[in-house]
Regions:
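A generic signature of intrinsically disordered, low-complexity regions enriched in glycine/proline
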Residues: 5, 53, 66, 94-96, ...
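C-terminal catalytic/acceptor-binding lobe
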Residues: 100-145
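Acceptor/aglycone-binding surface of glycosyltransferases and processive sugar-polymer synthases
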Residues: 5-87, 114-123, 130
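Catalytic donor-sugar/metal-binding loop of nucleotide-sugar-dependent glycosyltransferases
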Residues: 58-59, 81-85, 94-112
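DNA-recognition element of transcription regulators
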Residues: 91
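The conserved acidic donor/metal-binding loop of glycosyltransferases
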Residues: 1-3
């Protein structure tokens, strides 16, 4: 939806990419900027992030930004194990990466709220929360890579 300017894309390809297999954009880092985001949307995102940190991923400040760069052979294994197809699919990928010991690096971005977003605040929040529980259940007995 172009909520991040395309000219920021080169920042995802970092010099240490040999030891970083996933680079994600974050709206929560100190130098990040959010432009035009309504308070209710921001609140919804922060509440969801608290749930993500409690149920799935502790060390990532913004799993839902949408800008992610995947490199390395091991990343293919993550997508083979992925089962969630909704908005929480990337939380599942990051959850699996964390369990596999794959390094995830967050970078600050300038992010623009797009009113044309397809997110339905109430329904999608409930579905994404349900997906967090599904992620935990689906991968409860997975072995590490």
């Amino acid at each position: 939806d172009l909520s991040m300017a395309i000219d920021q894309l080169d920042r995802f390809f970092v010099p240490d990419s040999k030891c970083t297999e996933i680079v994600i954009g974050s709206r929560e880092l100190q130098l990040s900027r959010r432009i035009g985001e309504p308070f209710t949307r921001r609140l919804m995102g922060r509440i969801y992030n608290i749930l993500v940190r409690g149920l799935a991923i502790r060390d990532i400040t913004d799993t839902q930004c949408g800008f992610k760069c995947f490199t390395g052979e091991q990343v293919f294994e993550l997508f083979k194990k992925q089962r969630i197809n909704g908005f929480a699919f990337d939380v599942e990928i990051l959850f699996l990466a964390q369990r596999a010991g794959i390094r995830v690096r967050e970078i600050n971005i300038e992010w623009y709220y797009m009113p044309s977003s397809k997110v339905r605040p109430i329904l999608d929040s409930l579905l994404m929360t349900w997906d967090l529980f599904k992620i935990r259940w689906i991968h409860k007995f997975d072995s590490n890579f």
